Amino acid sequence: METIVRDAINSDKFSVLSFCKDTFSWGDYIQNVWDYWLSEGNLLVIEKQYPVGVCHAFFSKNQVWIEGIRINSNFRRQGFASDLVRHIELLAQEKQILSSFMLIDTENLPSLSMAKSLNYHIFQTWNFYSLSPQINNSHKIQFGNVLNSTATHYVKSWRWLVLDEETLLSLSVQNKIIFSGKFDDVSTAIITDSEHFDKTLIVTLFSGSQNNTLDLVSYIQNYSAENNYKKIQILTKEKLPFLHTLEHKITFTLMQKFLR
């Protein structure tokens, strides 16, 4: 039976969500973002009489971000995930986009193997931490852009987006870039609101010295508590110091492919 890749429609939602329930130990997030992704466009399904796989693409500044690849467990190992990725790559090439990125759990060996078979390589490794909001006044941070060229991306709603001069200026004007430089190497963070989950703060952290990082963490906790955030999600390439309010959740590989 022929399979086709097409744009998702709202009536696909029930059948798609039926195989997006137990992806992670805690469940899945597709049900929470389906409506957003559908309205954004580039939400794709692969069907064999009915949808057996789904994937979303987000195009921005000469890159495509591939997210939410899910395949019905009864149809895995048939190349459907690869078909979805290739379809998105073709869309990107039509837009003359040069790079494709996706994020994969370091322990998800089948997905890593699939990505490598499509000529993706490991670009960076990132750690995800959750932090509890709490009133904490033991901090002294500053606002402003002190990032160097090694900071290539920041995280916005779990998409790794390019940090170019225009973006840095916009974030700086909005006071979204904070730093602490009291002790040795400067630590810097970019704070943004999740576009898909209420009262969730997403932090991209570039950690310098441990004391500077702890200074930023204290500020972020206090800022979140004062502004009634429920969750703080920190993404960083570094290992963070131990705190009882800070929990390491998962480590990801950021995969990249240059599109010709």
Where would I find each of the regions flagged by the language model?
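A short, internal acetyl-CoA/4′-phosphopantetheine-binding micro-motif in the GNAT/acyltransferase core
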Residues: 69-77, 203-212
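Conserved N-terminal entry element of GNAT/NAT acetyltransferase domains
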Residues: 1-10, 133-146, 260
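Conserved acetyl-CoA pyrophosphate-binding loop and the N-cap/start of the following alpha-helix
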Residues: 75, 79-87, 212-219
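A conserved beta-strand-loop-helix scaffold within acyl/acetyltransferase catalytic domains
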Residues: 21, 27-44, 53-69, 190-198
